[in-house]
Amino acid sequence: MISVQPSLTPQPGGRVRRVANAFALAFVSLITVASFAGSAIRPGDRVAIIGNTLADQLRVHGYFETFLLQLPAEPRVSVRNLGWAGDMLSARDRPTNFQTEESVLIAHQTDVIIACFGLGESFAGTAGLPAFRTALKAFVDSHRGRKYNGKTEVRLILVSPIAYENLGTLTPEHERRNRELADYTAAMEQVATGQELPFVNLFQPTREIMADASAPKLTTNGIHLNAYGYWAVGRMLTAGVATIPPPWALRIDASALRATGDGVTIMQVEPVAGGVRFSVQEQRPPTLAPPLKGPIHAALQPLRDTLAVANLAPGEYLLTIDGQPVLTATDDRWAAGIAVDTSPRHREAETFRQAVNDKNQQFVYGWKALNQVHIVGERKSSPSGQALPAEVIAFKRLADEQDEALLRRPVPLALTHTWQLTPATRPSSRP
């Protein structure tokens, strides 16, 4: 049996507890034994993410932040992502006159910092490990006692690099790189344990799922995650810092007209037109769908909302929700269980993620203005250069307004929808 450790979460008294479950369970139940109040991220936290390209691209894809905003506890968290591609602990260069990180942390009234480092540093190999430990301890010390929210000491969460993916001839040294990354992950864990900090180990679970050569790739070049990779790692990272409710699981017996559900309440199961119809009342938001068609890693399949319908007569069946077609499959596939994350409610969840991404884009325009020639260069005194400060302020205001809108945006629950499976009249689609 293979086990994974997507996180170390703090326990009362500052001790660090390793959380591990069977790999076959993917990551859906890795920390469900802990209450949200005991998690590294707490309701209402104002979170800042800093670090390398992994952190930077969390902002671009938005899965991690959306997963956090979907957590059931209120109030919701507020996130600002200060990740910068290529950042290392000892190399965090910024343009001339760029605002300090401290000023942004104070402006956000930051309660907790999620720090992603270790990838760039790992290229120094074994010889670089002592310097990495020293730099990481210095980083922790630099935030020790700081009260960016004006009230309480900021909390730190350390996040390891992901594994190095084998892409054949594109990554000829993946075995050596993974040995180095394992060493740097272990060093980061040692520092976290010594400093009594939460630690999220992304290296081990990503290395395990990358071993499935038949599954879709998680990265574009062995190092940088693609959209699917950020969906998967976003879920892992969320499981490392908070308690994630399991996804929807609907189970129907079309013959006995019985049903059970996780995340939903199923009512009024009845036969209809050679199939079955039932009402579904949602108790939790739908889970974000992976951003690709076709199969995903078998170990990640339990992260998806699913419907299983047993004892259908042989044939193909169309699932509709409130009359809208969702997907078609054969009776044996329905009996085995199928992911149902293309429903109207799942499309609403994707729209919410896009709103998160838009907020983050407005923040970047205000925080990391791209046209330096108008800020400190030769066009600083031009009309466009003189107008830029007001534009930057406007972008910051837009980001704050959109953030507040996201925090207030209701998550419609206890909604009841009519689900129905009836014999299909078209070829089955393969979700």
Language-model segment annotations:
Residues 17-22, 430:
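Intrinsically disordered, low-complexity, compositionally biased regions/tails
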Residues 36-39:
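Boundary at the C-terminal end of the N-terminal hydrophobic targeting segment
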Residues 22-34:
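Bacterial N-terminal signal peptides
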Residues 5, 17, 27-28, 387-388, ...:
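Compositionally biased, low-complexity segments enriched in small residues
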Residues 41-43, 62-80, 87-430:
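Alpha-helical cap/lid subdomain in secreted, periplasmic
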Residues 46-59, 85-90:
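Catalytic nucleophile-elbow at a beta strand-turn-alpha helix junction centered on a G-D-S/GDSL motif
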Residues 3, 7, 29, 428-429:
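Serine residues within intrinsically disordered or low-complexity segments
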Residues 1-18:
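N-terminal secretory signal peptides that target proteins for export/translocation
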